[in-house]
């Protein structure tokens, strides 16, 4: 897939209202944390590491899919903090909506 198209779909995730809302809520909730904050840097670091593992293991996942997963892997953290919902369950529900809206 062409790089320009890949970045367009990743940009759609970043600008999606649900992603932006959940990310902002998480940033506010973690503003006083010193370590292990779920910042954009964290999301992108995870994506970069996943991409390296993907190449080394010849797993065959697309760069677009890896970056989408990296951006969304902790998107349910705020709901976990506020409601006690396991973040992987909250995240799966939120990610499904975001990914569907972004034509994944």
What does each model-found stretch correspond to?
Residues 1-104:
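Metal-dependent phosphohydrolase cores
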